Amino acid sequence: QDIRLMKSISFINIRVAHQIQGCANQVMDYLYSDDGRFLNTLVISPPRCGKTTLLRDMIRQVSDGPRTQRSGRRIPGVSVGVVDERSELGACYQGVPQNDLGMRTDVLDCCPKSQGMMMLVRSMAPQVIAVDEIGSREDVQAIEYVRNCGCSLAATIHGSSLEDIMQKPAVGELIQQGAFERMILLDCRGRAGHVASIWDGRGNVLY
């Protein structure tokens, strides 16, 4: 149910989207198949540990075409569709992203994730779809639709471990089905955005 009215407000929190270009360099090598396809990726992180910042730079690099650090090869950029439900990825102003999301990126700003993912598939034909903070049953249904349409997916979710995520009814089922080919765990050890682990879709540790 939508919130229609709020009153007796005692404080206000203003969140400012903060981009850090290059923060995804450490993980990009793990996110592509041998033939250059972007692998379905889930970023797991507690609040305030950098998952949205990491996703934002992943989007930019996938769109522009990253240069892998281990091989040094340039992977061609692809079209990316972003559903920015809370305007935290692109920070759009009058329809224009104020953060750099890449030259091949289309953004649906202030649009519900579950509806936006299906709208992008039907109208924009992206090769990769990116969303922040999934979790609802509707989100999972939209993700299944995206996968069945041949799009790759990049998403984030709140959690402190892979076991924690497996306990979430809807998302846990997706992971058991192998929907995500890469899973990245962030923690705040020493600094926000610290990469603690990277797994493949079968739970094998890659990093």
What is the role of each PLM region?
Residues 1-39:
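P-loop NTP-binding catalytic core
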Residues 1-8, 182-207:
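Conserved P-loop NTPase
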Residues 34-36, 46-47, 64-65, 69-75, ...:
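Conserved catalytic network of the ASCE P-loop NTPase/AAA+ motor domain
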Residues 38-64:
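Glycine-rich phosphate-binding P-loop
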Residues 41-43, 81-83, 106-108, 130, ...:
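Hydrophobic/aromatic beta-strand patches that form the interior of the parallel beta-sheet core
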Residues 54-57, 113-119, 142:
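Well-ordered alpha-helical segments embedded in enzymatic catalytic cores
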Residues 63-118:
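P-loop NTPase switch/communication element
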Residues 124-183, 188:
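Conserved P-loop NTPase nucleotide-binding/switch module
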